[in-house]
Amino acid sequence: MVKVVNSSGKHKTATARATVMKGTGKVRINKIPLELYTPELAMMKISEPLLIAGNDVVSGLDINVDVRGGGIIGQANAVRTAVARGIVEWTNDTAIRDNFAAYDRNLLVSDSRQKESKNFGGPGARAKYQKSYR
């Protein structure tokens, strides 16, 4: 039986589901290879857990990620969390887990912060409409 690990990551309204399996080192996000993923900043954010884990670990894995919702950077953060969790679960290596935690805790723990909702009396969550006294 083929070993397959499923993991997920969230950031704001973006949700990513990663599937990690034995392979040749291919990483795909929504069926697009990581090397072709745009913008470059998002691609660099997603590649962080791959660089920290090391080429010897990642070269033997295929990682397919499906991400929905949110914006570009929110999706990138959700993907990097899902990928990091998948690698940790696949390897069962505490050293890799510790390296991820030391670099950025959000690689393993989803960022639960949400947008503050708009309130009455103003255009946004905190701002108020201008008041005239005369």
Curated annotation (Swiss-Prot):
Pfam families: Ribosomal_S9
InterPro entries, alphabetized: Ribosomal_Su5_D2-typ_SF, Ribosomal_uS9, Ribosomal_uS9_archaeal, Ribosomal_uS9_CS, Ribsml_uS5_D2-typ_fold_subgr
GO cellular component: cytosolic small ribosomal subunit
Keyword annotations: Ribonucleoprotein, Ribosomal protein
A GO biological-process term: maturation of SSU-rRNA from tricistronic rRNA transcript (SSU-rRNA, 5.8S rRNA, LSU-rRNA)
Region feature (Disordered): 114-134
Gene Ontology molecular-function annotations: RNA binding; structural constituent of ribosome
Domain of life: Archaea
Identification of the protein by name: Small ribosomal subunit protein uS9
Organism listed in the record: Methanosarcina acetivorans (strain ATCC 35395 / DSM 2834 / JCM 12185 / C2A)
